[in-house]
């Protein structure tokens, strides 16, 4: 390469070679592919893997991001994913000696919000159908089942939407969010749904709707019933009421391989409570999950909690924390994985860094403290150095911590950092113009 030539990174090279069908797609590529590329470099993905993942993003994800923001930065379709309604997210998972990059987005199209798609249902269905051929085992039976249960005809959706004055609630009524994990040479797809619109239509509790829809899978759900029953008992318990627990949404794999033996269902609970003891109550399902592994998990959770959350000095374990960013979505989220044949669910907690966390670089330092406590020492475990290299530009953070999730599997912690790209750091809607699509 000549000294005057500039070496393109994979996200730039793919853009130059593949182009875009609209300025909107080029905008979202600029805002989405850059941080994803940086995250893959952090996770030590090979160049070939970086191209594979970015090619998937270009073909299947970018066209579903919808119109770019208005010039004032306001989103075309406002979602619950972040306090500023950014509909995209990148994340990196750490487990033992592996780092895995993931993405999530709420599919949106130009018809979202119109009479032809009042509550944004079309883009999710279209995206999954387009991806159906991707891999053996990629199966839409469950999506079709749950869509039948919770999607509304457009005429009904239009009437119900017009009656909802609480627009924050409407934004939380996500009919479909898609997330992708990118382990070596594979793509794993997960669909998340919230039956809020069906709840508004019928008046039935959200938790009842979710659990009944899982039971309605019939024989395919038989292996999940034991874990589901444990979760149901907790949701209906006084401990759950005391902790302010509300069922929020659920998710499921579309990779229904091995006759469903490798497929998860996740049920998400939310609470506005932030006292550490309440977190433990929910994480352990009121003590239903117990034993030496759970003891190790709660000890590790305490360290991670204090490492990334801005806990006031002297705060007692029964005291709640006041959010730095007061917002209806400033909740602590939990999910409980249920697997076929498992006797109890597997818990995960999402620490809400965007609302209760320390400044981003202090969170990074806290992650280093936690990683060292786990004995993690791979190059990608140098969290502060890697975070600064990936997401610090001219002393400004370009991707903010939104959540830090924690679970415990076997002998070790399972931790994921979720980031909200600062869109104006990559493509400021007020000044951005396409370079490739002209």
UniProtKB/Swiss-Prot annotation:
Q: Which gene encodes it?
A: janD
Q: What is this protein called?
A: Indole diterpene prenyltransferase janD
Which PANTHER family does the UniProt entry name for this protein?
Answer: INDOLE PRENYLTRANSFERASE TDIB-RELATED, PRENYLTRANSFERASE ASQH1-RELATED
**In UniProt terms, what function does this protein have?**
Indole diterpene prenyltransferase; part of the gene cluster that mediates the biosynthesis of the indole diterpenes janthitremanes such as shearinine K or shearinine A. The geranylgeranyl diphosphate (GGPP) synthase janG catalyzes the first step in janthitremane biosynthesis via conversion of farnesyl pyrophosphate and isopentyl pyrophosphate into geranylgeranyl pyrophosphate (GGPP). Condensation of indole-3-glycerol phosphate with GGPP by the prenyl transferase janC then forms 3-geranylgeranylindole (3-GGI).
NCBIfam families per record? arom_pren_DMATS
* Pathway entry: Secondary metabolite biosynthesis
Q: Which family does it belong to?
A: Belongs to the tryptophan dimethylallyltransferase family.
Keyword Oxidoreductase (UniProt): no
List GO BP terms, alphabetically. Answer: alkaloid metabolic process
- What is the reported phenotype of gene knockout? Abolishes the production of the janthitremanes shearinine A, F or K but accumulates 13-desoxypaxilline.
Q: Which Pfam families match?
A: Trp_DMAT
Q: Does the keyword Membrane apply?
A: no
Q: Give the UniProt keywords, A-Z.
A: Transferase
Q: Where does substrate bind?
A: 102, 190, 264, 266, 268, 350, 414, 418
EC number(s) in its UniProt entry?
2.5.1.-
Q: Which residues bind L-tryptophan?
A: 80-81
């Amino acid at each position: 390469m000549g000294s005057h030539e500039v070496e393109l990174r994979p996200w730039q090279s793919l853009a130059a070679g593949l182009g875009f069908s609209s300025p909107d797609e080029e905008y979202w590529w600029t805002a989405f592919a850059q941080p994803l590329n940086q995250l893959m470099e952090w996770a030590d993905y090979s160049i070939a893997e970086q191209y594979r993942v970015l090619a998937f993003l270009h073909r299947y994800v970018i066209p579903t991001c919808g119109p770019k923001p208005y010039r004032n930065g306001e989103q075309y379709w406002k979602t619950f994913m972040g306090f500023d309604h950014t509909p995209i997210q990148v994340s990196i998972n750490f487990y033992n000696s592996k780092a895995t990059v993931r993405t999530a987005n709420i599919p949106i199209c130009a018809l979202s919000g119109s009479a032809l798609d009042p509550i944004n249902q079309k883009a999710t269905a279209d995206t999954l159908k387009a991806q159906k051929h991707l891999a053996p085992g990629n199966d839409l039976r469950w999506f079709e089942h749950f869509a039948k249960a919770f999607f509304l005809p457009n005429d009904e959706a239009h009437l119900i939407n017009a009656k909802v004055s609480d627009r924050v609630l409407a934004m939380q009524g996500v009919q479909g969010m898609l997330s992708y994990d990118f382990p070596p040479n594979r793509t794993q797809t997960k669909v998340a749904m919230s039956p809020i619109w069906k709840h508004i239509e019928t008046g039935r509790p959200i938790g009842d709707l979710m659990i009944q829809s899982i039971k309605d899978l019939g024989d395919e759900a038989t292996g999940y019933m034991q874990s589901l029953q444990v979760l149901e008992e907790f949701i209906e318990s006084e401990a759950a009421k005391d902790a302010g627990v509300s069922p929020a949404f659920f998710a499921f794999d579309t990779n229904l391989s091995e006759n469903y033996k490798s497929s998860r269902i996740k049920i998400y609970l939310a609470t506005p409570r932030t006292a550490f003891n309440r977190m433990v109550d929910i994480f352990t399902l009121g003590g239903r999950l117990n034993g030496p592994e759970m003891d190790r998990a709660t000890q590790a959770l305490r360290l991670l909690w204090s490492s990334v959350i801005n806990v006031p000095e002297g705060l007692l374990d029964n005291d709640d924390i006041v959010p730095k960013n007061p917002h209806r979505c400033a909740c602590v989220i939990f999910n409980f994985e249920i697997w076929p044949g498992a006797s109890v669910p597997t818990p995960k907690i999402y620490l809400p860094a965007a609302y209760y966390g320390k400044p981003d670089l202090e969170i990074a330092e806290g992650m280093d403290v936690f990683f060292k406590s786990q004995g993690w020492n791979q190059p990608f475990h140098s969290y502060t150095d890697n975070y600064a290299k990936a997401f610090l530009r001219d002393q400004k953070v370009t991707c903010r911590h939104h959540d830090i999730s924690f679970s415990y599997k076997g002998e070790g912690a399972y931790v994921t950092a979720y980031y909200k790209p600062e869109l104006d750091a990559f493509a400021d809607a007020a000044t951005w113009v396409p370079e490739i699509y002209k």
